[in-house]
């Protein structure tokens, strides 16, 4: 290793020159010690390989002959390769890509197959074509709706049923007990009694109510044109409301003066006596 190389390495590593030189010297010594051994191994390897390469054995010769014969007699697996390279051959083979059916077409084919199966099943079962179409369209089988149940709040309870029985029993018992005690006139048919009562009420009402006398015809009032015009003028320009000042003055005019009480007159006389000045005595 040159000094320039060693200096560059030391500068790149950032080590002091003294330490770097000592390390590089040690590495050079070790390399010089190992070099002769490496050279000896390389020489021995080359000597062993050279005779095999230079002097071919009988086995290698036989192998090369067989290989050359087979290579010349080989037939190409792909004949298009030879046609493509042949200059006399006019037609050139074009590789056509493999046609793949799209997935959409496969789905449509499956749908058609299912429809054909369903139609074949319907035809085997029988029926008109209209029914077949309806059955094919209505895939979901509709279940019949159950009848609605009556709500619980409309059902009679045990208490209400017992009360109804009690009232009916009481009515029947009262009829049995008090029916024989009534006079024979009261045992008449209820429908006849009701008709008699209605006839009696109608007669009494017709006797009591006085007959209405026919009302005299109304005579339309004749108004002059001047009255109608004055009424319109009053309605337009008559003051319906009063201002606050006018209303206060109107109240003061209509206000009644109450008579003074005796206590007020007595107090005024007393106050006047106090403030009265008497003549001084000389």
Swiss-Prot record:
A Gene Ontology biological process annotation?
Answer: establishment of mitotic spindle localization
Q: Where is the composition biased (Basic and acidic residues)?
A: 163-175
Provide this UniProt record's keywords sorted from A to Z: Cell cycle, Cell division, Chromosome partition, Cytoplasm, Cytoskeleton, Mitosis
Query: Which coarse location class applies to the principal site listed for this UniProt protein?
Result: cytoplasm
Q: Where in the cell is it found?
A: Cytoplasm, Cytoskeleton; Cytoplasm, Cytoskeleton, Spindle
Any one GO MF term held by the record is: microtubule binding
Name the residue ranges with Polar residues bias: 242-268
- Ranges where the record places region Disordered: 28-58, 115-185, 207-229, 242-282
List the record's Gene Ontology CC terms alphabetically. Answer: cellular bud neck; cytoplasm; nuclear microtubule; spindle
Give start-end ranges for the coiled-coil region(s): none
Comp. bias (Low complexity): 117-128
- Stated family: Belongs to the SHE1 family.
User: What does the protein in this record do?
Assistant: May have a role related to the spindle integrity, which is essential for proper chromosome segregation.
What name does this protein carry? Mitotic spindle-associated protein SHE1
Q: Which organism is it from?
A: Candida glabrata (strain ATCC 2001 / BCRC 20586 / JCM 3761 / NBRC 0622 / NRRL Y-65 / CBS 138)
């Amino acid at each position: 290793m040159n000094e320039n190389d060693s200096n560059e390495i030391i500068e790149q590593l950032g080590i002091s020159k003294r330490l770097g030189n000592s390390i590089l010297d040690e590495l050079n010594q070790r390399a010089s010690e190992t070099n002769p051994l490496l050279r000896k191994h390389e020489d021995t390897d080359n000597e062993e390989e050279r005779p095999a390469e230079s002097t071919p054995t009988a086995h290698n010769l036989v192998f090369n002959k067989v290989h050359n014969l087979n290579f010349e007699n080989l037939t190409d697996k792909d004949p298009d390769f030879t046609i493509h390279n042949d200059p006399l051959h006019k037609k050139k083979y074009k590789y056509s890509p493999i046609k793949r059916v799209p997935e959409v077409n496969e789905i449509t084919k499956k749908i058609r197959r299912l429809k054909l199966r369903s139609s074949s099943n319907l035809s085997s079962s029988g029926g008109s074509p209209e029914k077949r179409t309806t059955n094919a369209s209505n895939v979901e089988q509709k279940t019949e709706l159950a009848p609605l149940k009556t709500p619980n709040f409309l059902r009679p309870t045990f208490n209400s049923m017992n009360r109804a029985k009690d009232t009916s029993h009481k009515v029947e018992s009262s009829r049995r007990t008090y029916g024989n005690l009534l006079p024979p006139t009261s045992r008449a048919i209820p429908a006849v009694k009701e008709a008699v009562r209605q006839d009696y009420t109608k007669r009494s009402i017709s006797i009591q109510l006085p007959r209405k006398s026919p009302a005299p015809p109304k005579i339309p009032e004749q108004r002059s044109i001047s009255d109608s015009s004055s009424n319109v003028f009053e309605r337009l320009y008559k003051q319906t409301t009063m201002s606050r000042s006018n209303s206060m003055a109107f109240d003061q005019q209509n206000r009644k003066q109450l008579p003074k009480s005796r206590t007020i007159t007595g107090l005024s006389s007393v106050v006047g006596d106090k403030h009265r000045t008497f003549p001084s005595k000389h």
